Amino acid sequence: MNNLGLIVRGDFSGLGNQTRRMTYLLKPQRLLYIDSTSFSKNKVQNLDWYSGFSGYVVKGFPSDRELRIFLRGLDSFTTCETSYNYNAYTIARQMNIKSSCVINYEFCDYLVRPELPKPDLFIMPSYWKLDEMKQRFGDDKVIYLPPPIDPNEFKEAREVNFKRKGAKRFLHMVGTLASNDRNGTLDLLEALKYTKADFELVIHSQQELPREYMVEDRRIRYSMRNVENTSDLYKDFDALILPRRYAGLCLPTNEALMSGLPVIMTDTSPNNELLPKEWLVKCKKIGQFMTRTMIDIYGSNIKALAKKIDWLVEQDDDIKIKAFDLGYSNFSESVLLPKYQSIL
């Protein structure tokens, strides 16, 4: 992994956290920091995340000239989701530099524009659509490799969660509002009508929620804020309830597991390729919508979700240990570093 370059973000977003963690794990020789103020909902920039690393800052989308300066002298470079300039892959190839992209299927432009310059390697961050991507682009051009997480980042949250007592306290992440109620918030709110168990449910969002998300239930508390330390989101809970309606990389699931929280999700890919069967909720296809291609939408079986919540209330602390073991074996730096070193 000599002379690696990495394109990074520093906003409070999934991409910001993902590229920050990859930087700390891979220790690239050079960074290209994308100041996303002009196009991201998250305006705060955290350039200090990358103190001690060499590189360049670009406001918005890099020009061909800026890419050539960034790539000069590198052996390979990696980016997440997008290169911010598709000429990056052509320029890298001209300079005999290997390129790779951690690609999310729903935002993969190559599904509708196969003529665009492609990286030498697609890295899939979840199992969702992995086989289809291999069929489209070749077995040797696509690999599954999830984003790394340092267990120490969530150590404090994990210790608090392991020690907490009393009535169960569950977390639901709305995050940044996405199309078609992606995280299944409305399904969860409907399921609450069918469970009388005693627990607290914290619904967290990064922005103000529509009226339909605001319901009167003594068990619900709303939290609408950004936090500087992602791990604080997962502190002092017993589980994450996230009945997602459509698939893709879900960093909150991975982060929750590292915090010692079991995660309740719909029984669809990639959830059912990661989580134990008993943590999954029956669901059915309820529609489709278009991103770069048609994406299936799933709705939870509401009464099954309510029963799963009742089941969760009765679980002892062993389920938290199981959650952390699952997170560590799949996402820890020590497990993933050799795999990244072998391909970059």
Please give the residue ranges for each predicted region:
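Donor nucleotide-sugar binding/catalytic pocket of nucleotide-sugar-dependent glycosyltransferases
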Residues: 120-134, 138-156
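Short hydrophobic beta-strand element within catalytic cores of glycosyltransferases
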Residues: 262-265, 272-275
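Aromatic "clamp/platform" in nucleotide-sugar-dependent glycosyltransferases that forms part
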Residues: 245
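Conserved catalytic-core segment of nucleotide-activated headgroup transferases in glycan assembly
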Residues: 151, 163-216, 227
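Acidic anion/phosphate-binding donor-loop and adjacent secondary structure
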Residues: 111-113, 148-167
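Short alpha-helical donor nucleotide-sugar binding micro-motif in glycosyltransferases
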Residues: 71, 232-237
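A charged, aromatic-enriched C-terminal amphipathic alpha-helix characteristic of glycosyltransferases
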Residues: 14, 159-160, 297-304, 313-344
